[in-house]
A protein has these predicted regions:
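Helix-helix packing/entry segments at the starts of transmembrane helices
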Residues: 19, 45, 100-107, 172-195, ...
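Specific transmembrane alpha-helical segments of multi-pass solute transporters/efflux pumps
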Residues: 21, 57-101, 105, 140, ...
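Glycine-/small-residue-enriched transmembrane alpha-helix faces in small-molecule transporters
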Residues: 1-41, 45, 80, 84, ...
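Juxtamembrane helix-entry segments on the extracytoplasmic side of multipass membrane proteins
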Residues: 7-12, 36-44, 67-72, 143-164, ...
């Protein structure tokens, strides 16, 4: 068995945390949407709260916010796919079950691998095998997710979310301009771009920003969205991508659909069928295989 390097010991756990944290999206988002809150408003407050928390953390650490002009341009571009991914996922929640929507986003490892091939970085055979196995596992889980009809619009939004999420991962991993920027500062600026985009979108659409967001429960959900699927998942994704590479980091995101299915079952009454259990088992085995036989 190959001995794991220091990068692997840091990157693999970070990748697992990324998947679990991001898979908690529906736990906080669905109650807000069910209360009538607009997608743009939810995402604006989610990102704005996250920016405030991260900004305070950076101030306490006395870390400089300074970036050069080229880095600012890259960070702006980096924030756009992450922003789009959240938008598409939340739109998908309107059409299909939340667990199914979040599970479909896990198509992004295949997209990452394809993008990396175009960048002349061909994954090793264990990684390809893991991608194939996890894709099969997700397909099985999707086929057993409750009794709701599958609306193609929701599927389309989920796939779009997966694609732009893949772009986000590759940008973090491949761009040398931001290599010197700390993970926390990178996350801060990516989320700052998102909060600005959602604020402009909300103002232009003329929506009531506070509609469906009144009451302590709503704000606790927004804080939950800001901390776990936003700050934690984004920061650990950056750590994983930098330590083990974009493709392996994306495969470890298998814990995202697993978490989403569990949340859907326990919180929203979505069925936990034998197909889902088999899919989870296949996915976990494939990730374990990748970790055991590969290292960086």
């Amino acid at each position: 068995m190959a001995k794991l390097s220091r990068n692997a010991l840091i990157g693999y756990p970070a990748g697992v945390i990324t998947g679990i944290a991001y898979g908690l999206n529906p736990l906080f988002a669905k109650p807000l949407m069910n209360n009538g809150a607009a997608t743009e408003a939810i995402l604006f407050f989610r990102y704005a709260i996250a920016v405030a928390l991260l900004g305070g953390f950076l101030l306490i650490k006395r870390e400089s916010f300074k970036v050069n002009l080229k880095q600012a341009g890259v960070l702006f571009i980096l924030g756009l796919p992450f922003t789009a991914s959240s938008t598409f996922l939340f739109e998908a929640y309107k059409y299909i079950a939340s667990g199914l929507a979040t599970t479909l986003v896990f198509l992004f490892p295949v997209m990452v691998a394809i993008i990396m091939v175009f960048l002349k970085v061909v994954p090793s055979w264990p990684v390809w095998l893991s991608i194939g196995a996890t894709f099969i596992g997700v397909a099985i889980m999707t086929g057993g997710n409750g009794t709701d009809s599958v609306d193609p619009t929701g599927v389309g939004f989920s796939i779009a979310s997966a694609f732009v999420y893949a772009l986000f991962i590759v940008l973090i991993n491949r761009n040398k301009q931001i290599a010197s920027i700390s993970n926390t500062l990178l996350t801060f600026y990516a989320l700052l771009v998102g909060s600005i985009v959602f604020l402009i979108s909300s103002l232009c659409s003329g929506i009531d920003m506070l509609s469906g967001l009144r009451g302590a429960g709503s704000w606790l959900n927004l804080i939950g969205l800001a901390i776990l699927p936003t700050i934690v998942s984004t920061a650990t994704l950056a750590i994983a991508s930098r330590n083990i590479g974009a493709t392996k980091a994306s495969v470890l995101g298998v814990f995202e659909p697993i978490t989403a299915i569990i949340v859907g079952t326990l919180a929203f009454g979505e069925a936990l069928t034998p197909n889902i259990l088999i899919g989870i088992l296949i996915s976990i085995v494939s990730v374990t295989f990748m970790i055991v036989v590969t290292k960086r």
